[in-house]
């Protein structure tokens, strides 16, 4: 059994659409990023890479490589998951927490879970996504940024029960 942790934070300030967990969320501003800025996917990729001791998202998809400019982060997730499948790992559990003062995430969480379930070929019950605020503290509290924490548990050569 392997456990990995990932974190990402992006500031608001882009004209890009706000996409979190592969879901388009209505918002007047997007997140500043080289890719499409899907910080949930980015933190999840880092957790998967951490669990398999394969490095971090930047080592696979460097921000100075134009090929990844504005790329759909779900494509990046699928590329990483395909590498992990070759190592005979399966997902036991994914636990994700989004920290955002704005916009509210609750109406979109089911769709985020559905996207991850599809992309990672795992049961939706293996995926937990929660959201909270920073109690109006710091850059997140001032609605300048959104952060995300992800934890992944993988098992090799068999399915989790």
Curated annotation (Swiss-Prot):
Reaction catalysed by this enzyme: 4-CDP-2-C-methyl-D-erythritol 2-phosphate = 2-C-methyl-D-erythritol 2,4-cyclic diphosphate + CMP
Co-factor(s): a divalent metal cation
Site (Transition state stabilizer): 34, 133
UniProt entry keywords in alphabetical sequence: Isoprene biosynthesis, Lyase, Metal-binding
Broad enzyme group: lyase
Catalytic activity, EC: 4.6.1.12
Residues reported in the UniProt entry to bind 4-CDP-2-C-methyl-D-erythritol 2-phosphate: 8-10, 34-35, 56-58, 100-106, 142
UniProt record, GO biological process: isopentenyl diphosphate biosynthetic process, methylerythritol 4-phosphate pathway; terpenoid biosynthetic process
Family according to the record: Belongs to the IspF family.
Record protein name field: 2-C-methyl-D-erythritol 2,4-cyclodiphosphate synthase
Name of encoding gene: ispF
